[in-house]
Amino acid sequence: MDQHLRSKGGVNIKHYYTEKEYKELLSHLVILHNSREKTSTHILDYLDSQNIKHKTKALKTGDYSFMIESCPSLGFVRDTYYDDLCIERKNSVSEIAGNFCEKDDRFLKELNRMTNIKNVYLLIEDDSLQDVLDGNYKSKLNELSLLRSILTVQKRSGFYLYFVQKESMGKMIYEICKNCLDNTILK
C-alpha cells in the first residue's frame, strides 16, 4: 500500500506500506469526539467493544473526526490531526428540523464553518428520508420546507447525508474515518 504526503514545497512524497504496516497504522487511528457533543454512550460502547481508540477533544466544528497517533516507524513523527474530515451527528429528523427553525441560526453558522472542509458528513440517527417526506417528526416546519432546507444546505455545503440506525452509528463513524484515511494516504 502506498502513502502520498504533500510536502511544504508541493512535492509528493510517497511511502509504501505492507499489509502488516497498514494494520499497525490502523492501530494508531484515534476517533476524536467533540468535548461539546453530548456523550453518546452507544457510540463509545461500540468503539470500546472493537478496541478502537477514541478521545475527547475540542473540535473546531462537527462532532467527530480522527487523528493518527505518533508512529515514527510509519512516517508519523507526531500526532497528526485530519482537519479535512468533519462528521456531524443528529439524534433524529426532529432535531435537524428544530435546527432549521432556531432563531439564533447556530446550525447554519456551523454549516458555514464546514464549507472549507473537504469531507463533511451529516449522520441522522434512527430515522429515514421517508420520515422527512412523510412529516414523521416533531417540528413546526412542514415536510416540504424541511426537505427543501436540507437539499439547499446540502448543495451549498457539499456534505454527504446518511440516515443510520442507532446501533450502527459507531461503526459508521469508524468506517468514515478509516475511509478518509485510506483516501488520503492511498491515492
Where are these regions (language model features)?
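Conserved catalytic cores of phosphodiester-cleaving nucleases, focusing on short active-site segments
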Residues: 83-91
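Non-catalytic C-terminal interaction segments of nucleic acid-processing enzymes
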Residues: 1-82, 94-187
